[in-house]
Amino acid sequence: MQKITFGDLTNQGICPTCYNREHGYCLTGDETDKTLYENDLFKCVLIGEPRAEGHTVIISQQHYKDMMEIPDELCKEVYVFAKKAMNAIKEVYGAESVYLCTMCDGPMNHFHVQLIPRYSFERRGSKNFVKERKPYVEDKAKVAELRKILN
């Protein structure tokens, strides 16, 4: 049996984020170890293949195509939380800065906000949004510290 991919679902007009959630995280695997915060509106998780250590995503629980579709209350909640998370990531991981990015611009999107740390040894600028992805390396102490700050 061939494994279904995010691209396969997108090509079929199916939101991969919603499909993944509805089918027991079959695409990304169990995210429990990477989940930093969750409520009825959104979930905040460390990325499985990060562009930098501490790369995090905030994903709306309900399906919205992009920021233009989300209710004002959700927008407020996500961005207030994002500010808190950015400061926490900077503190816990020692990042010089944390970029906030939302680029929902494909045939099948699900609103999300990415928080991508930039470290002092890295160049500034938008190229950080497309840095090569790396394998996720769990750091239980840092995850615990982030959870403590964010919850």
Name what the model sees in each region.
Residues M1-N151:
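HIT superfamily nucleotide-processing domains
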